[in-house]
Swiss-Prot record:
One of its GO terms (molecular function) is ATP binding. Pfam families: AnmK. Coiled coil: none annotated. This is Anhydro-N-acetylmuramic acid kinase. Its EC number is 2.7.1.170. It is an enzyme of class 2 (transferase). Transmembrane segments: none annotated. It comes from Cupriavidus pinatubonensis (strain JMP 134 / LMG 1197) (Cupriavidus necator (strain JMP 134)). One of its GO terms (biological process) is peptidoglycan turnover. It comes from the Bacteria. Belongs to the anhydro-N-acetylmuramic acid kinase family. The gene is anmK. Pathway: Amino-sugar metabolism; 1,6-anhydro-N-acetylmuramate degradation; Cell wall biogenesis; peptidoglycan recycling. Keywords: ATP-binding, Carbohydrate metabolism, Kinase, Nucleotide-binding, Transferase.
């Protein structure tokens, strides 16, 4: 007999494309309890493959299929690590919620429905792990006229909401997004703000060969170029009204290079560009907080950007009167929030309960999200 209880695994590989974050969560209590956590870095070749698949290219179907196989093996490695940490067997887990790697996200375009594509091989993961897998969470919301993103605001409300005050939860991954949590009975809203770490990671990789800017130290050594910042913020996405979502297929290296190419004036140092990109991330978030969450007095940050001290300081400067904290101040590691969300979404699917918030995504209504791949 399988003694699964209410234990689920959530695995998230986000737009930063640095690897997979995974958690084993017990939902039997009042709050989710993380029993184990793991991070599995992507091999360089897999990260490069997913980077190339963000934009049109040759032989995409073949390359995506092989990348999906490789990702399933990375995810299966996470599962093995989690079970070992917790001293559990595959039969002790109800399901895995596997997000996959977003390679295109274009809801509402082309034919009014558009599409979103997360590369992965859930059937292979189920085969390797011996656990039911729930995947493809976003497409059902898109089919209902929604953006398919963000999907974590419902969990943000459960973990960080407070009936006594309005709060904002901000995830800074490759793309940044916010969840506005009202302090009353008002509706939760959420949307993508713009680039988070994606362009920062690209630029430091190109210039210094480093995967990321540790604590934002390189950005802090440069100066913000106001002309370049204004050119970036002139992109129509920043002034579009929510619900809205975006991805690396908009904010990609060519997007940055085009703005650098049209800039006039004295030459910028590479560190100046990095400082300006960090300022772009912070300013896009701050603008949206001011426009859509004016009563909020607390901004709670998660994701890799929460460890970028330069961005965090810029946020505090741009939002006077707002306490800027991280989810770790509330007992949740910054790297675990989205993985917990996909464990929760898998549970919602198996229980046939909605996983989206229609006021966030713009969908026609609540929908059960995900497709089930039995073990």
């Amino acid at each position: 007999m399988r003694a699964q209880g209410d234990r689920y695994i959530g695995i998230m590989s986000g737009t930063s494309m640095d690897g997979a974050d995974a958690v084993l969560v017990d939902f039997s209590g009042e709050r989710p309890a993380v029993l184990a956590a793991a991070h599995e870095p992507f091999p360089d070749a897999l990260r490069a493959d997913f980077g190339q698949l963000q934009q049109p290219g040759d032989n995409e179907i073949h390359r995506e299929a092989l990348a999906a196989n490789a990702l399933a093996r990375v995810y299966a490695g996470c599962v093995t690590t989690l079970l070992g940490q917790a001293g559990l067997q595959a039969g002790d887990v109800a399901a895995i919620g596997a997000h996959g790697q977003t390679i295109r996200h274009r809801p509402g375009l082309y034919d009014e429905i558009g599409y979103t594509r997360q590369s992965q091989h859930p059937a292979l993961l189920a085969e390797l792990a011996g656990i039911d897998v729930v995947a493809d969470f976003r497409s059902r919301d898109v089919a209902a006229g929604g953006q398919g993103a963000p999907l974590v605001p419902a969990l943000h409300q459960a973990l960080f909401g407070d009936g006594a005050e309005a709060r904002v939860v901000c995830n800074i991954g490759g793309i940044s997004n916010i969840s506005v949590l009202p302090g009353d009975s008002g509706a939760v809203i959420g949307f993508d703000c713009g680039p988070g770490n994606a362009l920062l990671d690209y630029w430091i990789g190109e210039q210094l060969g480093m995967p990321y800017d540790d604590d934002g130290a390189w950005a802090a050594s440069g100066r913000v170029d106001e002309a370049l910042l204004a050119a970036c913020l002139a992109d129509p996405y920043f002034n579009a009204a929510p619900p809205k979502s975006t991805g690396r297929d908009l904010f990609h290296p060519a997007w940055l290079e085009a703005r650098l190419a049209t800039r006039s004036g004295p030459a910028l140092s590479p560190a100046d560009v990095q400082a300006t990109l960090a300022a772009l991330t912070a300013e896009a978030i701050a603008r949206d907080v001011r426009a859509h969450a004016a009563p909020a007095k607390r901004l709670i940050v998660c994701g890799g950007g929460a460890r970028n001290g330069y961005i965090m300081r810029r946020l505090a400067q741009a939002l006077p009167g707002v306490a800027v904290q991280t989810t770790e101040d509330f007992g949740v590691p910054v790297s675990q929030v989205e993985a917990i969300a996909f464990a929760w979404l898998a549970r919602q699917c198996l229980l046939r309960l909605p996983g989206n918030v229609a006021t966030v995504t713009g969908a026609a209504g609540p929908r059960v999200l995900g497709a089930i791949y039995p073990r």
